[in-house]
Amino acid sequence: LLFPFISFSQDSLNMSLLGYVDYPNTNGIDIWGWVDSSGNEFAIVGLRDGVSVVDVTDPSNPDEKFFIADIYSVWRDIKTWNNYAYVTTESDTGILIIDLNDMTGSTYWHVKDFISYNLNDTLHIEAAHNLFIYENGYAYIFGASNPPGYAAPPNGAIILDLNASSINPTYVGNWNSHYIHDGMVRNDTLWAACVYYGSAFFIDVSD
């Protein structure tokens, strides 16, 4: 278990603390897990000032492999596909794509422009609230936004295809009837929490 701070003031129910990594000068925002081809387990931790990747194969001895400093933000969301981590933030850095094959932390990209599947359009994204990646290699970007001077992107769901290129995803479509705060996909259905509308929507994404 990884915590931005540790408190031992009360007992846990059926749980024992095995180890932790302390981040004394920042705060934790999000966490995601990833397993490499050898079965080693990693925690990918979103922090206010970047992203930390920690080897937790031995949970009693977690080992931070690298840290990527990034623009300060109170929000990051992380998902993985194959050997890459994808990080959204509400600051204007695009989507951070990290190559997890390189445990030095030196191989990553901030991607802001996504070419459509028919090559007729390019979608520009500076910030996004959340993302979800389904097992078929399609990423769903939720709550995207751009600063003044850029065209507003769809702030519902933006769909990216990661299959052809993990570091250069293709823009394949969007649903933009309402702002989506969070969502998930199972089979051909997107389950979307449209917080400002006060409703959940179930959207057919089969095509």
Please state what every model-predicted region is.
Residues 9-207:
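Feature marking well-ordered beta-strand scaffolds used for ligand recognition
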Residues 1-9:
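Sec-dependent N-terminal signal peptides
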